[in-house]
Curated annotation (Swiss-Prot):
Record lineage: Bacteria, Bacillati, Bacillota, Bacilli, Lactobacillales
Function: Catalyzes the conversion of N-formimidoyl-L-glutamate to L-glutamate and formamide.
Co-factor remark: Binds 2 manganese ions per subunit.
Residues that coordinate or bind Mn(2+) 1: 133, 159, 163, 253
Annotated protein name in UniProt: Formimidoylglutamase
Amino acid sequence: MLEDYYPSTTSYYHSGIDDDLYTAKWGMVMTFLDLNDSSLTPFEGTHFALIGFKSDKGVYINNGRVGAVESPAAIRTQLAKFPWHLGNQVMVYDVGNIDGPNRSLEQLQNSLSKAIKRMCDLNLKPIVLGGGHETAYGHYLGLRQSLSSSDDLAVINMDAHFDLRPYDQTGPNSGTGFRQMFDDAVADKRLFKYFVLGIQEHNNNLFLFDFVAKSKGIQFLTGQDIYQMGHQKVCRAIDRFLEGQERVYLTIDMDCFSVGAAPGVSAIQSLGVDPNLAVLVLQHIAASGKLVGFDVVEVSPPHDIDNHTANLAATFIFYLVQIMAQHN
């Protein structure tokens, strides 16, 4: 039995007015799945599993605005409204949430990793609804556990922050996940391949830039780089990063986008990547056929305005699933 795991029991979705797939919405098509069901066998074809990570403990430790614990429900509600374009050949299963208000951050990350591995063993592509960006380390661990020790796993993070902070004194938090991944790779004598899109210089100290400069395998583009380059040059940079890689894990921190597009986040951003450009870049990553899982994190519904941020997060999920279904 998976720890801290709660299958969905309350529907966030609606039945709609008919059963015609040409007019169906996500909320009419998505079905519940219990990962603890021992009778399940690996699925054939390309299918997805949606799981919520109900934790913003890392945000609290990092002195951010808490509220991301409420985001899985908010994103599900927005996603349910979107039209379904994938017929009956592709399924998106809602498998529930990882939740443990009295559990430690490390325990919840470990529980998420085991749920992710279970999804991968069932041949389901994980989609995680954070939660703070501490979500990423648990997701990454689960993906790595589903691979052999020699398999590669590159990481792309769309984020205004590197999230490479040391954690020896403070302990893990929402800003340390990728340093934890880096340290794991060093311990295993692997190269940690990490590409951050949307870095803002005013959100990252000199220590972090120096760490990146000295670390082979880590690349980044600032938000201003992306603005000047345009999506085609950004996509070419991603292609170079992924050359020779077989698998990539993608994580989207909603503070990558300006407060006008994403007001409901843990750390608001005055500047940010254009969401339209982001969709083109995300579609390109998905079209590589290398994407094995992704998450959307740091949506904070108590600070949102008319569900703008939750809707944008759901929009990214919509377009990623559309393309992944065609290229996996």
